[in-house]
């Protein structure tokens, strides 16, 4: 993880809280899930072995804060520009990250830590700054959402569902599950 020192300074090591590790945390996981998790376990075991767990979490948090500051600079500049009223900003990641949960340090799982992503949309006249929505959605919704926000018609057979109703009102009932896929044939479905 790379970030200027001032972002590391936001997270003193003595204040870093480590995730709880359960001795039998994988006991209820099917063999396929345990096998997937085992492929990347060496990285986490190495971090623990060398006493770098808190430092690794600190670096992760510093990187997030650094990225957040840069996004803030971009949005502040946009707010001061002539393009503020006709620019849609979409920011997302393709995966989340485990910080030791389930003895895992990486992405590459179908658990919450790896499937929950940052996902922000700022659309003039549609979204309100600081609004959050607890509904599960997936990245297949980005393209149809942008089409609707731009007043364009979707092509037939397009995957995904526009989330414009949620952008307008996060309390809108939502029955469409979020689907996450990792490698071929390994999926997770998340709904309310």
Model-assigned labels for residue ranges:
Residues 1-136, 149-156:
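Active-site-proximal cap/lid insertion segments
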Residues 93-101, 127-128, 138-143, 147-192:
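C-terminal cap/loop subdomain of S1 sulfatases and analogous C-terminal strand-loop tails that border
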């Amino acid at each position: 993880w790379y970030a200027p020192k001032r972002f590391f300074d936001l997270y003193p090591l003595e204040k870093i809280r480590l995730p709880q590790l359960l001795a039998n945390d994988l006991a209820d996981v099917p063999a396929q899930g345990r096998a997937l998790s085992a492929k990347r376990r060496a990285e986490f075991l190495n971090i623990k072995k060398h006493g770098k767990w808190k430092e690794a979490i600190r670096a992760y948090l510093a990187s997030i804060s650094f990225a957040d500051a840069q996004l803030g600079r971009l949005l502040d500049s946009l707010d001061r520009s002539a393009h503020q009223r006709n620019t849609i900003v979409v920011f997302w990641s393709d995966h989340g990250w485990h910080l030791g949960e389930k003895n895992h340090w990486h992405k590459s799982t179908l658990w919450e830590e790896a499937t929950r992503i940052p996902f922000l949309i700022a659309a003039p006249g549609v979204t309100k700054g600081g609004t959050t929505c607890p509904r599960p959605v997936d990245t297949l919704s980005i393209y149809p959402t942008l089409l609707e926000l731009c007043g364009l018609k979707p092509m037939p057979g397009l995957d995904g569902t526009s989330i414009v109703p949620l952008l307008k009102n996060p309390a809108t009932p939502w029955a469409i599950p979020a689907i996450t896929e990792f490698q071929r044939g390994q999926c997770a479905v998340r709904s309310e």
